[in-house]
From Swiss-Prot:
Lineage start: Eukaryota, Metazoa, Chordata, Craniata, Vertebrata
Sites carrying sugar chains: N102, N205
Domain of life: Eukaryota
Cysteines paired by S-S bonds: C30-C143, C54-C99, C276-C293
GO cellular component: extracellular space; plasma membrane
Organism, as annotated: Gallus gallus
Gene Ontology biological-process entries: axon guidance; negative chemotaxis; neural crest cell migration; positive regulation of cell migration; positive regulation of inhibitory synapse assembly; semaphorin-plexin signaling pathway
Family statement: Belongs to the semaphorin family.
Name of this chain's protein: Semaphorin-4D
Amino acid sequence: DDKIYFFFTEVSVEYEFVGKLMIPRIARVCKRDQGGLRTLQKKWTSFLKARLICTIPDKNLIFNIINDVFTLKSPTLKEPVIYGVFTPQLNNVGLSAVCAYNLSAVEEVFSKGKYMQSATVEQSHTKWVRYNGEIPNPRPGACINNEARALNYVTSLNLPDKTLQFVKDHPLMDDSVTPVGDRPRLVKRDVKYTQIVVDRVRALNGTIYDVMFISTDQGALHKAISYENGMHIIEETQLFPKFEPVQTLLLSSKKSRRYLYAGSNSGVVQSPVAFCDTYTTCFDCVLARDPYCAW
């Protein structure tokens, strides 16, 4: 892809309350962005950002702090899937969630979604509203593609000032990126998730499973697999005896010998992705539902 995506949490600019409302974002820039010739000189001409939704609507639960993301790519997937680990803004809630987003849903928002503009009339707590006016051509924030080149816009330096001024004034999208299934893949009580990696595994019977490895702020690792239309935690491992936060989590690229590497302030731990030797009978192995293991 010719685009770069990055994730962060920021204070809401759309609304203003007594307490600061935090919003999880995904932003996008183009790799070949050279800035503008006059407007946005030596600055991004393609910067756009949108809200990431991770909520349980029927329970009015909002997970608005993003802690980590992982992009799952696989030949068995039609497109990359972005997994994000979220917690609520209020620390006393004691919940964590994992939401997944198709890359096409992200691109739909940036390439076809509505923009926002600063509110011209004071409307209680609302500071930004949907922009319903005319959108310049080429589309603001879009990367230089064949359509733009056909109009003689070869680089961002060629883009008209009207397009550049628009993206400078309207970097925020009105449309939000919604998760797969419109709800979290996993919600866990009494835990704060910090990092995530995801693997895609074909079991001995040919069934493909998504396996999530999620670390906690107490030095533990949860392993969850997809079956029966849901994610289920099948294993918990204590990685660090001092119950310290896991700050980095990596999955080795070698398919033959899969290992996880977890880092904290005190050190690094190497762990296998599965402990198959703990299942001493066929019944125990099947009951564990671990796609890495077979009897």
